[in-house]
Amino acid sequence: MKLMICTSNKKKFEEISSILESLKKDENLDLEFVKPPKEIEVEEYANTFLSNAYLKAKAYYNAFGIPALADDSGLVVEAFSDNLERPGVYSARFYKDSFGSHVLKEEDFKLSKDELNNLKVLRLLEKEENRKAKFVSVVAIVLSNNYGIFGEGELKGHIAKEPFGNFGFGYDPIFIPEGYNTTLANIENKDKISHRRQALEAVFFMLKKML
């Protein structure tokens, strides 16, 4: 069976396909992981990770008729979150969010999106004692018009004082997982503990029962 991995983020595609290949090998399943024939624009307007993952997977399934896997994931910082988890579903574009926008200066916008997001989190936490945070990932697989399966993963930790490490992407350089004294971006085998792996393992467990 072909399974389409729906993301335009090259690093995310590599991480997801690598995890899935290792799971497939362990179970000796007949699965082929493919990129979509072309990228399509999907408006992720929902306010939960689950809904956004489903929206993307369903849109790609409808476009190409191939079983589709999509992930929506993000960082949740306890000190920023009251009734709304932040950055949460807005993690990829947190630097644009009006929440805390005063901490970014005009000259900062020469940085990459990932660097801007990390910088904003660090500046907002400069005088904050509570640095607890967690990564959340929800994976959706749409197998037909009427059937989908879901898996969720969570990795708890806290925010570092400064970025460190060259592995990973996104908020990995500023996130220290529980039980570690370095950032996720400095852990070479981070895929073995990541929130995304947990979500993929959960959904893979359900998928293998159907094959």
UniProtKB/Swiss-Prot annotation:
Mg(2+) binds at E43, D72. Its EC number is 3.6.1.66. It is an enzyme of class 3 (hydrolase). Substrate binds at T7, S8, N9, K10, K11, K12, S73, F169, G170, Y171, D172, K190, H195, R196. It catalyses: XTP + H2O = XMP + diphosphate + H(+); dITP + H2O = dIMP + diphosphate + H(+); ITP + H2O = IMP + diphosphate + H(+). One of its GO terms (molecular function) is ITP diphosphatase activity. InterPro entries: dITP/XTP_pyrophosphatase (IPR020922), ITPase-like_fam (IPR029001), RdgB/HAM1 (IPR002637). One of its GO terms (cellular component) is cytosol. Gene3D superfamilies: 3.90.950.10. GO terms for biological process: nucleotide metabolic process; purine nucleoside triphosphate catabolic process. SUPFAM superfamilies: ITPase-like (SSF52972). Binds 1 Mg(2+) ion per subunit. Keywords: Hydrolase, Magnesium, Metal-binding, Nucleotide metabolism, Nucleotide-binding. It holds the Pfam family Ham1p_like. Pyrophosphatase that catalyzes the hydrolysis of nucleoside triphosphates to their monophosphate derivatives, with a high preference for the non-canonical purine nucleotides XTP (xanthosine triphosphate), dITP (deoxyinosine triphosphate) and ITP. Seems to function as a house-cleaning enzyme that removes non-canonical purine nucleotides from the nucleotide pool, thus preventing their incorporation into DNA/RNA and avoiding chromosomal lesions. HAMAP family: Non_canon_purine_NTPase (MF_01405). Homodimer. NCBIfam families: RdgB/HAM1 family non-canonical purine NTP pyrophosphatase. This is dITP/XTP pyrophosphatase. It comes from Hydrogenobaculum sp. (strain Y04AAS1).
